[in-house]
From Swiss-Prot:
PANTHER family in the record: 30S RIBOSOMAL PROTEIN S16, SMALL RIBOSOMAL SUBUNIT PROTEIN BS16M
GO CC entries: cytoplasm; small ribosomal subunit
Keyword set, alphabetical order: Ribonucleoprotein, Ribosomal protein
PROSITE patterns with a match to the protein in the record: RIBOSOMAL_S16
Domain of life: Bacteria
Lineage: Bacteria, Pseudomonadati, Thermodesulfobacteriota, Syntrophia, Syntrophales
Official protein name in the record: Small ribosomal subunit protein bS16
């Protein structure tokens, strides 16, 4: 099972927020996930990113691959993501 760390869209129409989730790469974007490790709200000024760092680092050490968008959000937050 290939595991990805990616964004799952939540919220109302035209007012999205996102959960940062760990899921199987074959699951739908907003479908089944293994764990919620954070959230991202682009509607706030400035955009708000909250992450459970210990859980995120544990999943990264287990081999989970973040998507490009998630890795950029984590870099802005100051969390090193392996290349």
């Amino acid at each position: 099972m290939a595991v990805k760390i990616r964004l799952a869209r939540m919220g109302a129409k035209k007012k999205p927020f996102y959960r940062i989730v760990v899921s199987d790469s074959e699951s739908p974007r907003d479908g089944r996930f293994l764990e919620i490790v954070g959230n991202y709200d682009p509607g706030k000024d400035p955009a708000e990113v909250n992450v459970k760092e210990s859980r995120l680092l544990e999943w990264l050490s287990k081999g989970a691959k973040p998507t490009l968008t998630v890795s950029q959000l984590l870099q802005k937050k100051g969390i090193k993501v392996g290349a």
